[in-house]
Structure formats: structure tokens, C-alpha cells
Amino acid sequence: MSKSQNFFGLFAVIIYTALTVVPILFAMDRLILVSGLSPVGWVQALDENYISQNTIGFTFFQAIASTILTIIIGFPIAWVLGRYSWPFKSVLRSILTLPFVLPSIIAAMGFLTITGPYGFDVRSNESTWWWTLVFAHAWFNIALVIRFCEPVLSTLNPNFEEQLRLLPNGKTFYSRFKNLWFPLIYPSITAASCMTFVFSFTSFALVKWITVRDKTLESTMAEVSSSAGIQGYMEFSSDIVLGASLIQFLILLTSLWLMSILQRRRKVKWQQSNEFFVQTNNTNGWFVLVPAICFVILPLVSIILGSFRVREVRSNSSTFIWSTAGWSDAIEGSYSFPPLSEALLNSLIYSFTTLA
């Protein structure tokens, strides 16, 4: 490698590090100037202020539940995609992993429509809000389980399982799973669980829209951050932001540490085969794929249908009618928001600029 390449490589690392670290250092300096350097006090402030009470417990509880449900839903999908051959498999994989690349507000609006008065009509029951949030997180993160687990399942040499069937510890599916599959895939499952937990732990839009009265650390910070770092004005908000940031930093650091360990364990230590030889036909897998596809596309379909339902206000009441007025307003714009063409152009400019 030439000296110029080394220089530009080092320069890129320095610029990236500066862009990442310097804003954080400035923010921390301003917040600590107001709150003082007391990490224990920052964390204690979360339960001492009414705005942030119970946020720590709720954040951990919903993240753990979301992770468990995501694995329960996602692993069977990864199994049938990895072990069996399917027509239009790339299309199926794209559909099943689509939620992860969609804005989280899409998931929120989709599930609110499903649970609303024109769906299952359970939104008025506040006890369903928590479950709606957990299912929305699972919908959003099942792509992680598929992406982490499917490559392992789709490339393992089938001779291993055939040989294990001849041994006493491989007579049943459970014994084969225990002695062959689980040791091979548990690093991938754990890695997917770590990432799912982090995304659920730091969730904002889904929590803000679905569980209106409950808040995570992320949504609490967003609520009070406008007054943080200002001396003499709502100084407790600086404590809340610092405490929540510290907890999130420790969670993220722990997850990255676990991921680095699991990444080493996920390195290929067995003989791999081509997917063409590993995967077989199994029509029973459709009993997994069809419900999974329905689960993935249902929120999207509900949003599309909802975009054609418009509230019509009359003198004494309001009703919903089917109309394209919503699309017309989106395309033409108004004083409150730009037209669709301008918003799309801005998105493309920002995305290509960031990519460059």
C-alpha cells in the first residue's frame, strides 16, 4: 500500500472520529457545566423527577419482551428460508426483511391503524398498548434474526446431519437440534438478540405513538432535551439527559462487546456447502412463510388503505369517507408542509450527499 493511500486512510479515520466524538464532547461539557460531575446522581435523577419516573424499568422490560418475541417469530422464518428451497426466494427474503429499512413511524402508524376503530378496535383498551408496542418492535426487527441465522442454516453440509442420525444422540429432531444445530446457531441467535435489544431499548417513534403514557429513556430525553444545558432553567432536565445517556451508553457498549465476541465464534469452523445441495423441498414450510408474510405486509396494507380514508366534518358530527383527497393534498402541499415532489427531492439530495 502506497504512502498516499495510508495518508488518506488515516485522514478518513481521523475525520470520522472527529465527527463522531467532538459533538458528544461539546454536549457533555455543556450538560456537566449545569449538572456537575456526578454519574450516580444523574441516574438517581431519573426516578426522582416525575417526568422520568419508571422509565428505566419500562425501557428494560419492553426491550426484553420485544427481543424474546422477535426471536420466537423470526427464528422459524430463518429456519425455513435457510433449510428449504423456495420459488422466488430472493423476493420472499426481501419482503420479510423490508420492515427493517422502513421509517419507524410507518410501523407505528400501521399498528395504530390495525388496532384502531377500523381494525381490531382494541386501541381504547390501554392494556393492549404494551403488547402493540412489543409486536411492532418484533415486526421491525425480525430482519435481524433472518440475516444473522439464515446464512448458517443454508450452508451447513447436510452430511453432518445424516451422520448424526446414525448415532444414538441423533435419533430424534430434538436430539439433533441439541447436539448439532444449537451449538452452531446460538452465536447467531445471541447476536441477533443483542441487536434487537439495542434497537428496542433505544426506541423512540414507536413508543411515542403507541404507548402514549409510558416512556423509554430515549423518548424521555427527547421530551426534556430542549431545556437541557441551560443554567438556571429546568436544570433537572440536564440530569435526566445525562443519566439516560449514561445508561444507553453502557448498554450499547456491552452489546458491542458481546457482538465482538460472538463475531469470532461465528467464523466458519465447519465444512460449508452450496445452498443448492443443502436446501430441499418442503411444502409444510408454507405454514410458516404465509403467516409471516401476512404479518409483515398487514401494517403496510393498513397504511395504504388508511391513506384513502378521509375525515369529513359536518355540522354536528364527523364521518370517514373513501377519497383521494389525502393524496391530492400530499402531492400539492399546503402552508403546513411542502408538496410531495419537493419532499422527495430533498430526501434524494440528502441521501446522495450522505452517500458521497
Regions picked out by a protein language model, each given a short descriptive name:
Residues 1, 38-48, 178, 322-335:
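A short amphipathic helical element positioned immediately N-terminal to and/or at the very start
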Residues 4-36, 49-154, 184-211, 242-260, ...:
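Membrane-water interface segments at the C-terminal ends of transmembrane alpha-helices
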Residues 258-288:
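Alpha-helical transmembrane segments of integral membrane proteins
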Residues 203-234, 315-320:
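Glycine-rich helix-loop "coupling/hinge" segments at transmembrane-helix boundaries
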Residues 84, 156-185:
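Short helix-to-coil transition segments within interhelical loops
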Residues 225-250:
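Helix-loop-helix hairpin linking two adjacent transmembrane segments in secondary transporters
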Residues 85, 120, 157-163, 264-275:
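Cytoplasmic membrane-interface regions of multi-pass membrane proteins
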Residues 35-38, 148-162, 171-173, 201, ...:
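Transmembrane helix boundary and interhelical loop/hinge segments in multi-pass membrane proteins
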